[in-house]
Amino acid sequence: MKLTLKHTVAAVALALISGFAMAAEHVVEMKNSGADGAMVFEPGFVKAEPGDTVKFVLVDPAHNSVSVEVPEGAEGWQSAINEGITVTLNEEGVYVYKCTPHAALNMAGVIQVGEAVNYDSAKAAVDKLTAAAATNKDRLTGYFEQVQK
């Protein structure tokens, strides 16, 4: 009986540890230029799972990352200008974010965590950002098209 209890405790501990080890870190760079043009988050679309983190890394100055749309129950974020930020995404859904100084250039991105439970509100946020952008109008829409319903 004592040996069985030890095995049970060990199995539970291993399951918990492996669950934490499976969480991934995704890196998004904030750049003046990249594969998708000027003033970009790279990559602009990230597919993640609940518990994953996204690390926004400042490559060039004068950028930040601010959430615009997050799923119900999720916490938004806002980094200061010239600072990166790491965000843990625990809630399933679509997260839309932007760079405040370069929103007019449609410097924005999309993260899908698990199921797209807030697809419609995320689409509305993308449409609003795109309508307000002076340039790169297809960029954010292209990222959002990668969201799987």
Question: Each predicted region: which residue ranges?
Answer:
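Bacterial N-terminal signal peptides that target proteins for export
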Residues: 1-9
